[in-house]
């Protein structure tokens, strides 16, 4: 199987749609300014969150800045955003090499595509947003030290979604001891990333945000739950599951504590479960809507 990261981001749209905490989303909709908010999304990938916010009628008139360090993602977004926008009945105009204008009688959205490391972007950005979005991203960063820079990007609100919180479950069980070992070692690789990361970032954000004098307006679980219906996974969720196993393989295939043959057999068995529509995958995550208060947040 060919593994493409943009394809993975496409495949998890329906998974994320279900997972996003709807109470936190309702709080966002109640607080987001109605008149042309400026939104910055860091680690934005190919722009799936922008599409979601349009589909869900969360934004109509907005300036939306997509920031991602992977050139592959930004290039894909540049082609894909006009495709789905046109399919949704919107007109699309390109403005230079890195801007898109999506519009009709209801929508007027200016999109800026920024290929940049998030910390480089923080250093040069001097126009704070009304809303900062970090979707499935904070658990990849050093915490809590990254938060002050991130919060400098918003004058008021931050929507921090799908923050992993230490629970990964594959069902049915293959080998209880091996399943637990693989989960433990995989979580440990998150904690040991050279670039930072935290396998329990969800629960830890409560304390981190409090220490910054940021007000948590809403918080709740946003678990990924993927299972087949009638032996078939919805949308492209089978590809999503294969990619999750690919993450495990890439992270653990040379781990000194893990028996190589046992792990290879485990991966093969889990892939067979996907083929037969038997695999259930659950990952526990947390969403937050946060209000920045005063200068302590910067």
What is the predicted function of each stretch?
Residues 43:
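Conserved S-adenosyl-L-methionine
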Residues 140-153, 162:
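A short, conserved alpha-helix within the catalytic core of class I
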Residues 220-274:
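C-terminal helical/coil "lid" or tail adjacent to the Rossmann-like core of SAM-dependent
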Residues 133:
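A conserved beta-strand element that flanks and buttresses the S-adenosyl-L-methionine
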Residues 1-34, 46:
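Class I SAM-dependent methyltransferase Rossmann-like catalytic core
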Residues 47-51:
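Glycine-rich SAM-binding Motif I of class I
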